[in-house]
Amino acid sequence: MLRAIPGVGDAILLKLVHAFGAPDAVLSAPQSALEEIGCRPPLVEAIRRGPAPDAIRELDKESEQLQRRKVTVLTYLDAQYPAPLRTIPDPPPLLYVQGSLLETDRHAVAIVGTRKVSAAGRIVAEELARDLAKMGFTIVSGLARGVDAAAH
C-alpha cells in the first residue's frame, strides 16, 4: 500500500517500515513522527493522505493477477524473506515468488533486461533461464515485461 503513495520508493519505504515497524503504523503515524525521521513536508502530506483511489484499484488488479499466476509476495518483514538479501545496502522491500523458496535457492541468478525485447532476445532469455535452471540455479526476476518475463 505504501508504494502507491507518490514519493515513496523502495529506499523510503524501507526507512519508514524500519522506523514504525509496519506499513499500517506508517499510515497512522503523526506528522511530527514522520518529520522526526526526516520526511519532508510534501512526503508527510502524501503519507497522511494515503494512496489515491486509482492507485488502490491498480494494486487490487495487480493482486488479482499475481493470484492467478500463483505468485506469492514476500515483504522485507516476512520471516521467509531471504537472509542474504537483508545484508545488501538497498534490499528490495518486496519479492515476487513463483513456486517455493528452498535452502538450495542460495544459488540464484537474476536475468534482467529491456522491457521492449526483440523476438531473438526473448528466445535467448528463455533458453538461458532454462539452461541455468537445469544446472540447479534459481532464476530471479522482477517480473517486468520483456526479458524479465521471458526468463520466467
Label every model-predicted segment.
Residues 129-152:
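Phosphate/pyrophosphate-binding betaalpha-module
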Residues 1-134:
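Short, positively charged patches
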